[in-house]
UniProtKB/Swiss-Prot annotation:
Membrane topology: Peripheral membrane protein
Annotated gene: atpD
Residues that, per the record, bind ATP: G135, G136, A137, G138, V139, G140, K141, T142
PANTHER family in UniProt: ATP SYNTHASE, ATP SYNTHASE SUBUNIT BETA, MITOCHONDRIAL
Intrachain disulfide bonds: none
Gene Ontology molecular function: any one: proton-transporting ATPase activity, rotational mechanism
Biological role stated in the UniProt entry: Produces ATP from ADP in the presence of a proton gradient across the membrane. The catalytic sites are hosted primarily by the beta subunits.
Record-level GO cellular component terms: plasma membrane-derived thylakoid membrane; proton-transporting ATP synthase complex
Protein's UniProt name: ATP synthase subunit beta
CDD domains in UniProt: ATP-synt_F1_beta_C, F1-ATPase_beta_CD
EC number(s) from the headed UniProt entry: 7.1.2.2
Organism: Acaryochloris marina (strain MBIC 11017)
Top-level taxon of the source organism: Bacteria
Length: 456
C-alpha cells in the first residue's frame, strides 16, 4: 500500500501511477484519504521506493493489449509478454470494463461436450455460461481443468484464454509447453498473475484476461473459452488488498466487499449476439468447507457446479467428481433430452441408495442386505468405477493412455450397468476405461485365452 500526496491536481481513482528511479513501480489509486492524498495498491514489488519519492500520474487506468496478434502469447497483468518472444505493438484497452447491459445479453441451450464421462453425464456445461470446479487442496482441480483444456481446445472453433491467478509458476510453464506440443497454442492466449507477485497484481489479472476475452467476443465476433485457475486466489488477493487498505474484515476474515468484487468479475462473463464467453473456473475450498463465504458467493454465479471429493480421491476414483453434490441447471429433459435426463437421474438414485446403505454394510455386512439392496450395491460400485477415466494430461505419470468419451458412449455404458448387462464383468474391468465396449472386449479376449489354455 502506498500513500501519495499531490500538491496540485489529484488524479481520478483507478489511474495508474508510476514511481521509482525508472518509473518501474506501478501503483493503482484506490481511495482518497484527504483533498490531496490518495492511497493506492502497488502492482509491482516496492523495492527501491522511498519516502518523498516522486510519483507520476500516467493519465490513464491500467491497460492491456487487444487484437488477433495476442494469440499464441503469454502475458502478465500489464499485458507485457512473459514468453520471451519479444514485445507487442497495437491497440490497448482499459481493463476496468463494464458488464454488458441486460438487453444486450443472450441465452441459449447449447451443450459444451468435454469428453469426461462424469461431467457430461451429471453436470453438463452450457455454452456461454460459467462452471466451477470446487475442491480442497490436492483433489485434482488443476489436473481436471488442464484435461478440459486439452479435450475442448483441440476441437474448439473459438479462442481459448487461460488465466492463472495466484497459482504455481511451474504449472503455468508446464501448461504452456503442453499446449505448444499439442498444436493448440496458436489459438490460445495465456495471462498469469503468479503467486509470488503482489496482491494488487493477482487482484487485477482476472480483469486483464476478461478484457482480452471481450475483444474477441465483441470485435472479432468469436466464441471464447475462458479458463480461470483459481478464483479463490482472486478473492484471497482482494482480502489482502482490503487489509492493507485498513478495512475491517467481515465473516471468517474476508473483505466486506467480497460479493461486489466477485460480481464485478463474474458478471462480465456472458453471451451476446456477437459471440459467447464460456468460463470454467477452479475454486479452492478452504478446509473442504462448502459453506465457506468464498465458495458460497461463487456458487451463486455458476450454472454448473462440479464438486471434487476427498473421499473419492482416497478411494482412487479419478476424476474425483462427487455425483451427488455436483449438478447443472442444464440437466433438464427440454435441454439434454429425455434419455440423458433419465439415465442421469437413475445413476444419482442408485449412488444415493448405496450411500445410505454404507453404514449398514459397515456394521452388519453385505450378506445382511435384502436381494434388491445387494443388487443396488453391485450396480453402484460398477457405476463408480465406470465413471473413472484415464486422462491425457496424466498419461506420462500413470502409463495409461488418455481417453475421450462421447456422451452417447457414456449413456450406453450407464444403461448397460443399470440393466445388469455388465453383471458378468468384474468391478475392476470397468475401472479406468473409456467406453464400456473396452471392458466387454477385454472380457471376451480373456475368456477365449482361457478356453485355448484348457484345450492345450
Amino acid at each position: 500500500m502506498v500513500d501519495v500526496h499531490f500538491s496540485d491536481e489529484v488524479p481520478p481513482l483507478r489511474h495508474l501511477l508510476r514511481a521509482g528511479p525508472q518509473a518501474q513501480i506501478a501503483i493503482e489509486g484506490l481511495t482518497y484519504l484527504s483533498a490531496n492524498l490518495i492511497r493506492g495498491i502497488a502492482l509491482t514489488p516496492t523495492q527501491g521506493l522511498a519516502r518523498g519519492a516522486r510519483v507520476i500520474d500516467t493519465g490513464q487506468s491500467l491497460q492491456v493489449p487487444i487484437g488477433e496478434h495476442l494469440l499464441g502469447r503469454a502475458f502478465n497483468v500489464f499485458g507485457d509478454p512473459i514468453d520471451g518472444l519479444g514485445p507487442l505493438k497495437g491497440m490497448k484497452r482499459s481493463l476496468h470494463g463494464q458488464a454488458v447491459p441486460l438487453h444486450q445479453r443472450t441465452t441459449g441451450t447449447d451443450i459444451l461436450v468435454t469428453g469426461i464421462k462424469a461431467i457430461d453425464l451429471l453436470a453438463p456445461l452450457e455454452r456461454g455460461s460459467k462452471a466451477g470446479l470446487f475442491g480442497g487442496a490436492g483433489v485434482g482441480k488443476t489436473v481436471l481443468i488442464t484435461e478440459m483444456i486439452h479435450n475442448i481446445v483441440s476441437r474448439y472453433d473459438g479462442v481459448s484464454i487461460f488465466c492463472g491467478i495466484g497459482e504455481r509458476s511451474r504449472e503455468g510453464e508446464e501448461l504452456y509447453r503442453e499446449m505448444k506440443a499439442a498444436g493448440v497454442l496458436n489459438n490460445t492466449v495465456m495471462v498469469f498473475g503468479q503467486m509470488n507477485e503482489p496482491p494488487g497484481s493477482r487482484f487485477r489479472v482476472g480483469h486483464a484476461a476478461l478484457t482480452m476475452a471481450e475483444y474477441f467476443r465483441d470485435q472479432a465476433h468469436r466464441d471464447v473459452l475462458l479458463m480461470i485457475d483459481n478464483v479463490f486466489r482472486f478473492i484471497q488477493a482482494g482480502s489482502e488488498v482490503s487489509g492493507l487498505m485498513g478495512q475491517l474484515p467481515s465473516r471468517v476474515g474476508y473483505q466486506p466487499t467480497l460479493a461486489t468484487e466477485l460480481a464485478e468479475l463474474e458478471e462480465r462473463i456472458c453471451s451476446t449476439a456477437h459471440g459467447a464467453i464460456t468460463s470454467v473456473q477452479a475454486v479452492y475450498i478452504p478446509a473442504d468447507d462448502l459453506t465457506d463465504p468464498a465458495a458460497v458467493h461463487t456458487f451463486s454465479h455458476l450454472s454448473a457446479s462440479i464438486v471434487l471429493s476427498r473421499k473419492r480421491t482416497s478411494e482412487g476414483l479419478y476424476p474425483a467428481v462427487d455425483p451427488l453434490q455436483s449438478g447443472s441447471k442444464m440437466l433438464t429433459p427440454s435441454v439434454v433430452g429425455q434419455r440423458h435426463y433419465q439415465v442421469a437421474q437413475a445413476v444419482r438414485k442408485t449412488l444415493a441408495e448405496y450411500e445410505d446403505l454404507k453404514d449398514i454394510i459397515a456394521m452388519l455386512g453385505l450378506e445382511e442386505l435384502a436381494q434388491n439392496e445387494r443388487q443396488t450395491v453391485y450396480r453402484a460400485r460398477r457405476l463408480e468405477r465406470f465413471l473413472t477415466q484415464p486422462f491425457f494430461t496424466t498419461e506420462q505419470f500413470s502409463g495409461i493412455p488418455g481417453k475421450m468419451v462421447s456422451l452417447d458412449q457414456t449413456l450406453t455404458g450407464c444403461e448397460a450397468i443399470l440393466d445388469d448387462k455388465c453383471s458378468g464383468l468384474s468391478e475392476q474391468a470397468l475401472y479406468m476405461i473409456g467406453a464400456v465396449d473396452e471392458a466387454e472386449l477385454e472380457h471376451q479376449e480373456r475368456e477365449a485365452q482361457e478356453v485355448e489354455e484348457i484345450g492345450q
